[in-house]
């Protein structure tokens, strides 16, 4: 369908408006994507993509202090992107579910494709 056809299709704009998420959902999506906008948080998520680890190990992998990793993990946990589980004196962090991994994988695939 050509661009002119879309602009002239009766009801097109109204349907698109109806299909748009509500303002609260848009704000939640905006907040979610903001979390991916921080390079340290993004490194943490990518490090956890292949399995969980404790804060000390994450700190070494990501290359920032333990306190910086802990601070970012708190934000990621609040946003339901990571979860923790205690194993004795250690706390292991992992991605919450396959949706988080899928978001990361799709973004990486998009980057690899480059411009069209």
Where are each of the predicted segments found?
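Short, hydrophobic-biased segments on the C-terminal half of alpha helices
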Residues: 73-74
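Short, solvent-exposed amphipathic helices
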Residues: 99-113
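Beta-hairpin "wing" of winged helix-turn-helix
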Residues: 77-87, 94
């Amino acid at each position: 369908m050509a661009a002119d056809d879309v602009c002239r299709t009766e009801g097109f704009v109204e349907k698109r408006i109806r299909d748009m998420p509500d303002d609260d959902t848009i704000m939640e999506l905006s907040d979610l994507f903001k979390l991916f906008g921080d390079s340290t948080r993004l490194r943490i998520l990518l490090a956890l993509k292949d399995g969980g680890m404790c804060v000390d190990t994450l700190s070494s992998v990501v290359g920032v202090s333990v306190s910086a990793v802990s601070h970012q993990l708190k934000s990621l946990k609040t946003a339901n992107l990571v979860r923790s589980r205690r194993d004795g004196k250690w706390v292991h962090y992992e991605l919450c579910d396959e949706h988080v991994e899928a978001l990361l994988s799709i973004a990486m695939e998009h980057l690899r494709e480059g411009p069209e």
